[in-house]
C-alpha cells in the first residue's frame, strides 16, 4: 500500500522513493498512521535532514507551538533538523495540487466569496455561507430558517460568545479543522455545546488530554495552540457537503435518496443562487462552490454572463444553460464540486474525464484516472495508457507502465504496444540512435523495482530480455 510505503521510506530516508510517492502516486503528505504520527515526524526522528527539507517544501505541516510541531522538534535527531523546523514557513499542499479541497474551503472561509450572511460578534464581522452552515450543523440550519431567516446581518452580543472562539468554530464547520489558542479552549467548548456540535466537543476533550500527557512527559515543550484535524478516512465533512449536491438535484433525478435535511428545492432549501439547465433538467446550485472549484465556471459566472437567461420568476436564481453534457454526467461533476468525491463506474470514466478536462477540474480527472485504473488488462492497458498521456494523468500513466512491466512478455507480441513504442520513439525531438524512450524507461524502472529476491532477479532479466528483443526487432536501440 502506498501509504505504508511512504512511512517506511521516511524511516529509511529514501528521498527518491518519497518524491515518487508524493509526485507520481499522489499520496497525501500529511497522512497519519495508527500512532497519530506523520511522515515528517519519522523523518525528524530518524535524522534524515534532506528528507525533512523536502517534506517541508512540499506541504508537510509543522507550525510552532502546536502538538505536531513540538513533537517533531522534540523528536528531531540533530540540531540542523531542529533549525530547519524552526525556520519553517508553511508551504501548503495546494502548491502541488491546485484544486486541493481543504485549501478551497479555507479560501472560501477567509475570503467570503459569494457569501450571503454576515455575523457580527462584538463588532467583529464574519462573512459566511448559509448553505455550508446549514449542511454542517442542525443548530445553524434551524436558526437560519427561524430566528435569522431573511437576515443578511446577524448581530451576536451575548457576553459569553468570544469572537476568537466563534472564528474557530466557523473554521471547523468549513474545513473540519480547528486551530485555537489554549486560553480560548473553554470558550470554544461552550460554543460547541450551544451549537450542538458533539463530535467537536469530544475531539476537543480528547486533544486536551493528549496534549496534557505529552507536555507532562516531555519537559521543555510548550504547546500554545490546540489543533483538531479529521482523520484521513473521516467522511463527515464530505458527507455533509454532499447534502448540498443532494439538494441541487432535480426531483426527477433524485431517486432513492430518502429524507433530506432540508425541504429541497422549495422553502428554505440550501439557498441556491444559480441554476444550471442541463438538457431538460434544472440543478439549483451555489456560485461559491462552482466558482471556487473551477476556473471555467468562474469565468462563466463572474467574468461574463453571456449564456445566462432571465429568471422565470422574480426571486428565482438566474439560469445558465450548459451544452454538450448530459444530466447523468453532470451529476458526477456536481458531487465532485461539493464533496470532492463521486461514485464513478469505470464505464462512465472516459465521458466524465472529457467533461472534467473541459471544465478545468483536475481533481475530478484524477478520480476518473483511479476508475480507469480498474480496467487494466492485457487487452486494454495500451489504450488506457494513451488516455493517461492525452489528459496528463501522471498517476494513471505510472500505473499503466507498472502493469505493462508485469505482463511485458505478452505485450511485446501485441501490435498496439509495438505501435505505442514506435510513436514514443518518434516523439522524442531530434532523437539520436541511442536516446532513451520514455515508455521503455518507465517499464524498465518498474521491472527493476520489483526485484526483492534472487529468484526475482532471473524473472526480471527475462522480462527485460523480451523488451530488448522487441526493440532490436523494430530497429530501435536505447
Curated annotation (Swiss-Prot):
Instruction: Keyword check for tRNA processing, yes or no.
Output: no
PROSITE patterns attached here? ANK_REP_REGION, ANK_REPEAT, BTB
Q: Where are the ANK repeats?
A: 1-31, 35-64
InterPro entries for the chain: ABTB1, Ankyrin_rpt, Ankyrin_rpt-contain_sf, BTB/POZ_dom, SKP1/BTB/POZ_sf
Q: Where in the cell is it found?
A: Cytoplasm
- Tell me which UniProt keywords the record has, alphabetically: ANK repeat, Coiled coil, Cytoplasm, Elongation factor, Protein biosynthesis, Repeat
Per its UniProt record, what CDD domains does this chain match?
BACK_ABTB1_BPOZ, BTB1_POZ_ABTB1_BPOZ1, BTB2_POZ_ABTB1_BPOZ1
Which GO MF terms are attached to this record?
Answer: translation elongation factor activity
Q: Which domain of life is it from?
A: Eukaryota
All copies of domain BTB, residue ranges = 115-182, 272-346
PANTHER family assigned to the protein according to its UniProt record, in alphabetical order: ANKYRIN REPEAT AND BTB/POZ DOMAIN-CONTAINING PROTEIN 1, ANKYRIN REPEAT AND BTB_POZ DOMAIN-CONTAINING PROTEIN 1
Record's protein name:
Ankyrin repeat and BTB/POZ domain-containing protein 1
Per the UniProt record, the source organism is Mus musculus
